């Protein structure tokens, strides 16, 4: 029954919506990000090319901290980003959890049927929903 519920809950119900995504432009440097956004509250930060509809990857907060500690303030986000997988907003949480495990990733880019960014979803988001459903 729990798995059935997770098949009915869609990414769009759980994701962080576009209007509140904290993301970084790919040409920003470590110095730019540290100056503008410290302390950084998120462990994984989406990186985009021109706008949020062109998310090209994500950076780990610890990579930013490490580059800062090594005085590598001129390193661009495009040089340290990891690839990000894109999913459709109507995918079920059950399928998304499987995909997180299969890809060994912890953040996905969420789009609508037109490929427009609608949000991001993390493994933590999906696990929280799984735990809530298990308690019901």
What feature does the model see in each segment?
Residues 1-136:
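Soluble cytosolic regulatory domains appended to membrane proteins
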């Amino acid at each position: 029954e729990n798995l059935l519920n997770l098949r009915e809950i869609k990414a769009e119900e759980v994701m962080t919506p576009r209007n509140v995504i904290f993301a970084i432009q790919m040409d920003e440097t470590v110095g730019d990000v540290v100056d503008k956004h410290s302390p950084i509250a998120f462990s994984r930060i989406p990186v985009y090319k021109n706008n949020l509809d062109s998310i090209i990857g994500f950076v780990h907060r610890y990579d930013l901290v490490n580059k800062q500690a090594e005085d590598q303030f001129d390193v661009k986000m495009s040089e340290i980003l990891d690839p990000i997988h894109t999913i459709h907003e109507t995918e079920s949480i059950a399928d998304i959890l499987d995909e997180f495990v299969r890809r060994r990733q912890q953040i996905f880019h969420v789009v609508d049927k037109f490929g427009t960014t609608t949000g991001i979803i993390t493994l933590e988001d999906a696990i929280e929903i799984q735990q809530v459903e298990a308690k019901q």
